[in-house]
């Protein structure tokens, strides 16, 4: 029989439905309360009602659930210690956008070997989010695939749309439907206008096509997300300095948007040298201590061990070390969090 479609599809595997996965790994009332309260706290920080600083910190990507849980335990102690000045949330990224090709994250390839056991990856990711939230540690993630959010979004307190997808219409539409505050990164070239356009688009009502929790394709009508914001992640040059922030605020003001933004210490702002995140932290802390109220949040790439490692066949991985972007180690992360908390003292 002749065909005119699916000519380049080599395999189609059955996928568990979001409702089936949620039934197996069910959210508890305590976790639900934690997610709701954290989202509300972030919204209040964004609007300036809460003077604390949002800190999204954690590994570039999650590849080892055991190491991620250990990191969450450590981070929760800092969350409690600095809760009067910081709203600390753990970065739990399960999807990785690639410039060309590469490992695309725990959900698509949990075994790190190209076997693509996606159903297992979804189960591992959801179970991990339950474990982390159960500690009292809220979770953040990037929403990349249009379907994966259906499996985990109920456990996410803050979401991001990455630099490569901020300009995408379908991601803006998805953001308009998400129940959590959503940050839009500026473009990889440093263009902040696309992020501002994304904020405006996500505030509006949209419709898009997506499966529901039972796997039935549906037409989603959204109300719009009022808590979109820009994440300054640098580009060809860093954009965390005071003049960059002032310029971004002027653009936000032009469209009557909330005059608050987030600074990513990594990526273009550290010139892709992870250790320079400490320099960004020093500069941002100084701006906050000198009275800047426009910086409502920061993002830091951090793990148990410093740097990154390459996955090699038949070679064990170093525990607690990133397999994607290089991260700061735990010791430096503790120092940066204290530095930020001290800077925020001036707001009170």
Swiss-Prot record:
It comes from the Bacteria. Gene3D superfamilies: Aldolase class I. GO terms for molecular function: 3-deoxy-7-phosphoheptulonate synthase activity. Pathway: Metabolic intermediate biosynthesis; chorismate biosynthesis; chorismate from D-erythrose 4-phosphate and phosphoenolpyruvate: step 1/7. GO terms for cellular component: cytoplasm. InterPro entries: Aldolase_TIM (IPR013785), DAHP1/KDSA (IPR006218), DAHP_synth_1 (IPR006219). Disulfide bonds: none annotated. It holds the Pfam family DAHP_synth_1. One of its GO terms (biological process) is amino acid biosynthetic process. Keywords: Amino-acid biosynthesis, Aromatic amino acid biosynthesis, Transferase. It catalyses: D-erythrose 4-phosphate + phosphoenolpyruvate + H2O = 7-phospho-2-dehydro-3-deoxy-D-arabino-heptonate + phosphate. It is an enzyme of class 2 (transferase). Its EC number is 2.5.1.54. Stereospecific condensation of phosphoenolpyruvate (PEP) and D-erythrose-4-phosphate (E4P) giving rise to 3-deoxy-D-arabino-heptulosonate-7-phosphate (DAHP). Belongs to the class-I DAHP synthase family. This is Phospho-2-dehydro-3-deoxyheptonate aldolase, Trp-sensitive. The gene is aroH.
């Amino acid at each position: 029989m002749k065909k005119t479609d699916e000519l380049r599809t080599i395999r189609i595997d059955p996928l568990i439905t979001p409702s089936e996965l949620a039934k197996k790994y069910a959210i508890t009332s305590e976790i639900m309360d934690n997610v709701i309260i954290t989202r509300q706290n972030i919204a209040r920080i964004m609007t300036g009602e809460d003077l604390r600083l949002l800190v999204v910190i954690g590994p570039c990507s999650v590849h080892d659930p055991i190491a991620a849980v250990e990191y969450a335990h450590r981070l929760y102690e800092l969350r409690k210690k600095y809760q009067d000045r910081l709203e600390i949330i753990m970065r739990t990224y399960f999807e990785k956008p690639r410039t060309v090709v590469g490992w695309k994250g725990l959900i698509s390839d949990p075994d790190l070997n190209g076997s693509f056991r996606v159903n297992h990856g979804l189960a591992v990711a959801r179970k991990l989010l339950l474990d982390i939230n159960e500690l009292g540690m809220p979770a953040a993630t990037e929403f990349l695939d249009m379907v994966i959010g259906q499996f985990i979004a109920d456990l996410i307190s803050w979401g991001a749309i990455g630099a490569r997808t901020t300009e995408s219409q379908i991601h803006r539409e998805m953001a308009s439907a998400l129940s959590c505050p959503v940050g839009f990164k500026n473009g990889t070239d440093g263009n902040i206008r696309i992020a501002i356009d994304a904020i405006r688009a996500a505030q509006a009502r949209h419709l898009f096509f997506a499966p529901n929790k039972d796997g039935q394709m549906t037409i989603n009508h959204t109300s719009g997300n009022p808590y979109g914001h820009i994440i300054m992640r640098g580009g060809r040059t860093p954009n965390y300095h005071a003049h960059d922030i002032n310029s971004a605020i002027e653009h936000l003001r032009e469209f009557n948007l909330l005059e608050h933004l987030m600074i990513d210490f990594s990526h273009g702002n550290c010139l892709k040298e992870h250790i320079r995140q400490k320099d960004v932290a020093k500069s941002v802390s100084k701006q906050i201590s000198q009275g800047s109220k426009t910086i409502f949040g920061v993002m830091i790439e951090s793990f148990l061990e410093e740097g990154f490692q390459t996955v090699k066949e038949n070679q064990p991985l170093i525990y607690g070390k990133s397999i994607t972007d290089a991260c700061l180690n735990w010791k430096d992360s503790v120092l940066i969090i204290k530095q930020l908390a001290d800077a925020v003292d001036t707001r009170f």
